[in-house]
Every structure is written in structure tokens, then in C-alpha cells.
């Protein structure tokens, strides 16, 4: 795992984590313990896997997620937004996440120490919620039913933009930025999802979900305010190549 530091005009050091996918986390916590950021921002995809069929909660099938969140919260205030892999989590799962002390930002915002932190929820999550409400099941099976919701819910961002303070938006999907966020008054957008392009040739990623071949938004700083993490693990059938997992620190 690599540590990457970007210097931007943030009021305090922010750690950006993304795409844990329920993997071991000791080296991540060691880095956070050494660096001591003021806040820890997790831009989605902490969970991995399909809902259980035995009546248990999805979060109960995750070996590392809750201990990881507790360990983060013991080091610094921790904020979490929802990525595409959180699509199946139900209300009970989300409550277990909140019980760790983590602040869940689900198309919502909060304030902390002069900062305004928001979380833009993945449209995959919204579509599964629609299915859940329709079928009145904790973990509905999509089956052959087509996906209906294909865009994030952005109406609440108008209020978020008006808040006084340094505005940080956790947004799992970097591809949302050009269409939904570029023209908004937001100081910092923190993303993941692209896994650095999975294989990298020099600075170019080869493939990213939602962007396809030779994606543009896989890591680094874009437009002076979009920061993308290459992610903390790999659950894809294709291994990473020239693309180590990454924890990002944004500091002044």
C-alpha cells in the first residue's frame, strides 16, 4: 500500500479511504495512526458480497467492516458515504454501521470543526431501495427486473452549497463530477470506485467501472478539487498491475 499526499487549501488534514471491500485493514490503521489526520473520509464500498439467504444481516457476513470502522473512529472523526457495493444494505445494516461511531452521510451533510461534510449516495443504492420498497423485503432479488434509477439524487446539494464553511463532498463515483458537480460551489470532492484503472501503464489506467477503457478519472487531483483514491483492495477477477492500493492524505 502506498501513501499519497496532496497539498490543497484544506483547513485540516483529511484522510481519504475508498474501496475496502471487506479486506484486512491493519496497514491502513497503522498509516492513520502514524499520520493522525483531523478527519477520516471513507468514500464508499466498505462492504463486499451478496446478501445472505439465511436471514442474517449482510453486515454480519462482513469479517472486517465493523472492526475497521471502530478502529478508524478511535483515531479521528470518521465520515462514510455509500458506494455501489452498499446497494444491498438495508436499514438494519446501516444502523450497525452508525453504531460504530461512524457518521453516515447518505445524501446528507453535517458540520465539524469549521467544515461541512456531505455524502452523495450511489445511484445503485437508490435503485435497490426502490426495489426494496416495492417488494417489502429486506434483501429483494432483482431477478430480471431492469434498473430504473440511473442518476444520483442531487437536489439536496443546493442546500449543501449554501452552508458556511469549507465544503467537502464524499462521492464514490468520480464520473459523477463532470456532469453533476463541476459547476457547483464545493471546495473538495473525494472519490474512489475506479481502482486506479486496475492495470496501469505509466500514469494511464486501462479500465474502470462506469468509464470503460482508458478512463480519465482514476486517481490524482482533477480541476484542483476532485481527489480520487486508487482504492484499498482488489476484489476484481483481474489483479492489479503497476497499481498498488492507496491511502490518500489531503493537507495544506
Predicted regions and their residues:
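Conserved beta-sheet core of the metallophosphoesterase superfamily
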Residues: 79, 174-249
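Solvent-exposed loop/turn segments at secondary-structure junctions
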Residues: 46-49, 84-88, 110, 123-125, ...
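Short acidic-hydrophobic surface loop/beta-edge motif
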Residues: 4-9, 107-113, 218-223
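Active-site neighborhood of phospho(di)ester-bond hydrolases with catalytic His/Asp-centered motifs
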Residues: 16-18, 39-45, 77-84, 105-107, ...
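Binuclear metal-dependent hydrolase catalytic cores centered on His/Asp/Glu-rich metal-binding motifs
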Residues: 100, 113-171, 177-179, 237-241, ...
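Core catalytic region of metal-dependent phosphoesterases/phosphodiesterases
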Residues: 25-113
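Acidic/histidine-rich helix-loop elements
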Residues: 14-26, 46-61, 88, 125-143, ...
Amino acid at each position: 500500500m502506498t501513501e499519497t499526499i496532496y497539498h490543497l487549501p484544506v483547513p485540516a488534514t483529511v484522510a481519504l479511504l475508498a474501496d475496502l471491500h471487506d479486506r484486512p485493514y491493519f496497514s491502513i490503521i497503522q498509516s492513520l495512526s502514524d499520520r493522525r489526520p483531523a478527519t477520516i473520509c471513507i468514500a464508499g464500498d466498505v462492504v463486499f458480497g451478496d446478501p445472505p439467504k439465511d436471514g442474517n444481516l449482510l453486515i454480519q457476513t462482513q469479517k472486517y467492516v465493523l472492526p475497521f470502522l471502530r478502529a478508524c473512529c478511535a483515531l479521528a472523526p470518521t465520515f462514510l458515504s455509500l458506494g455501489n457495493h452498499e446497494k444491498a444494505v438495508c436499514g438494519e445494516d446501516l444502523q450497525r454501521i452508525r453504531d460504530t461511531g461512524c457518521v453516515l452521510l447518505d445524501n446528507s451533510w453535517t458540520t465539524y470543526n469549521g467544515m461541512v461534510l456531505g455524502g452523495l449516495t450511489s445511484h445503485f443504492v437508490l435503485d435497490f431501495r426502490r426495489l426494496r420498497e416495492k417488494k417489502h423485503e429486506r434483501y429483494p432479488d432483482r431477478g430480471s427486473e431492469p434498473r430504473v434509477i440511473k442518476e444520483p439524487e442531487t437536489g439536496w446539494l443546493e442546500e449543501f452549497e449554501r452552508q458556511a464553511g469549507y465544503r467537502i463532498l464524499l462521492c464514490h463515483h468520480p464520473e459523477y463530477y463532470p456532469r453533476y458537480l463541476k459547476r457547483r460551489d464545493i471546495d473538495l470532492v473525494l472519490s474512489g470506485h475506479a481502482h486506479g484503472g486496475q492495470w496501469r501503464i505509466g500514469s494511464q489506467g486501462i479500465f474502470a467501472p462506469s468509464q470503460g477503457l482508458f478512463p480519465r478519472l482514476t486517481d490524482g487531483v482533477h480541476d484542483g478539487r476532485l481527489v480520487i483514491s486508487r482504492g484499498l483492495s482488489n476484489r476484481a477477477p483481474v489483479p492489479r498491475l503497476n497499481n498498488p492500493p492507496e491511502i490518500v492524505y489531503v493537507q495544506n
